[in-house]
């Protein structure tokens, strides 16, 4: 299982669910992975995939204490019918550059991408069990 440590105290280690529940580490640091996992897919295979398909694959790789069904439920709940664009994050070509439009959420700000999924991750069935285990 991937563990997360505080940026200010490497001795403070949590599971993904524990880090999500706690939010900010005891010493006011952020939780980051102790090691970056090897992605279980080839990045080239993500070409042409939807935002939700990519989100499920990437989040599943980093939050391995959630089941595949929990990740799917969280991503679908967070990103279905909540953005102006069905693509969630449209990519627009401007000259030779490809630009991600991160302003199609409820507040028209990039934070909608991360914060839309947070309540779903907090209330996923497994996280309730993780919360109880970590408090005991």
Residue ranges of model-derived segments:
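PLP-dependent amino-acid enzyme catalytic core
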Residues: 1-135
């Amino acid at each position: 299982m991937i563990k997360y440590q505080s940026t200010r105290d490497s001795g403070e280690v949590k599971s993904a669910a524990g880090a999500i529940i706690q939010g900010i580490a005891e010493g006011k640091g952020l939780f980051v992975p102790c090691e970056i996992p090897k992605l279980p897919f080839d990045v080239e295979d993500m070409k042409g995939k939807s935002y939700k398909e990519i989100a499920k694959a990437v989040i599943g790789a980093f939050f391995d204490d959630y089941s595949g069904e929990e990740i799917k439920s969280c991503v679908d709940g967070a990103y279905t019918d909540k953005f102006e664009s069905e693509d969630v994050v449209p990519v627009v070509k401007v000259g030779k550059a490809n630009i991600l439009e991160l302003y199609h959420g409820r507040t028209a700000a990039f934070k909608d991408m991360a914060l839309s999924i947070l309540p779903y991750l907090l209330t996923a069935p497994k996280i309730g069990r993780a919360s109880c285990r970590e408090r005991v």
